[in-house]
Amino acid sequence: MRVIFVISLVSFMFVTWQTNPVHCRQHKTPQVVDLGYSGAKVETVMKTSDVVYAKPMCHGGRCPPPPPTKTCSKPSSLKAVSRAGHAGYFGTIGSGKYKNNENCWWSIQAPADQRLRLHFESLYLEYGNRYCPYDYVNIHNGKNENGQRLGKYCGIKAPDDIITTGNSAYVRFSTDSSVTKYGFRLRYSIVSCNSLHTIFGSHGEFGTVGPAYGNFEECSWKIEVPNGKRVRLHFKRFHLENNNKYCPYDKLKIYDGSSASASLKGTLCGKRRPKDIESTGKTMFVTFSSDISLTFPGFRIQYSVPASCSVVNELTGPSGTFGTTGSQYENNEVCSWKIEVAQNKRVLLHIYRFNIEVEANCEYDSLTVYKGPNDSAPMLGKYCGETIPTFMVSSGNTMFIKFQTDGSARKPGFWIGYTTG
């Protein structure tokens, strides 16, 4: 005798096979309503709401309960496709403990270009040792247990989320004839972003995929560029759930380093596209998480290596430093700094190092210093090569410095400090 429940509410297929309606049955979201069955024929009726009815075909009256059994029926394979952004649940249910000699399985399938995330919401099985010889949950890649085993679990310590390498997963729950516990509950969902990725190179893109990200997402990206360079993030699109400035629901976090223990540069949500964000070193770490409720189109981020100096810098403190970074500056840069100190004060420049491409009139690469707030002010000097005054003074409380390079030779660059006089 066999009952088949087919649930096609989320964007992948979920199938359960069972002959014990108390212990191996689908949880809510979607809810399965068991109307009882006889040994004749079962018709599965799909609803557009969150309820799926398994309707028995009987000859008058309510069907009698099935005879008691302790194992699930043989596996089968069905496919269903629906909209994204939802999660489902399965496992042992009921108010008591699971039975001895259970043998239940579930096959879960996502669309061809997606992967699955399995999350243990609870786990309480008999524990013997780390090999789980008694009661256990086995999880495999693929549609059956011939696929790569991703893990075998027992006891009470739930593992980290399990991510499939393909678009399907196979889960088997098996118990022996002795001790019983309270079972387990698994949540499954589509991985809409790329889970954990380390990205190398000087440019590229990453972000969520599809028309909307899913619930319960936990994704991260580590971006690493060559030594001496920095990472710049440019947001091509951005739309997450928003509630307030603290982003309590769905959020994107950006860290100035190689992991989430680095300095946090920002927590982002809502639909206002953020400004470009730059790292101070060669790595940046980005995490995205979503909750159980609303989903939105997500984000797409372009990363690149910026010019070795800041594109625009306004320096307003009484002292500071600025210049190129790395072993050599980049070609085709145009960078500038505006220094403004207190009224009735002057800017004092101190040249610590200076080495840029040389040309008689500094037509290739050059550093130009202006006696005012912008490049329309009178020019104090235009410099290249390795020759420059080691000390310069403004005529007022502002000074503007512009660095420009062409497309050919590169040099170590410069580093300048300023104080107030």
Swiss-Prot record:
SMART domains the record matches: CUB
InterPro entries recorded: CUB_dom, Sperma_CUB_dom_sf
Keywords annotated in UniProt: Disulfide bond, Repeat, Signal
Signal peptide, first to last residue: 1-24
Keyword Disulfide bond: yes
Known tissue expression: Detected in vestimentum and trunk but not in opisthosome or obturaculum. In the vestimentum, expression is restricted to epithelial cells under apical cuticular plaques.
Paired cysteines (S-S): 72-104, 132-154, 193-219, 247-269, 309-335, 362-384
CUB domain span: 72-191, 193-306, 309-421
UniProt superkingdom: Eukaryota
GO terms classed as biological process: chitin localization; extracellular matrix organization
A Pfam family: CUB
Disulfide bond keyword on record: yes
Function: May play a role in protein-protein interactions during tube assembly.
Protein name as it appears in the record: Exoskeleton protein RP43
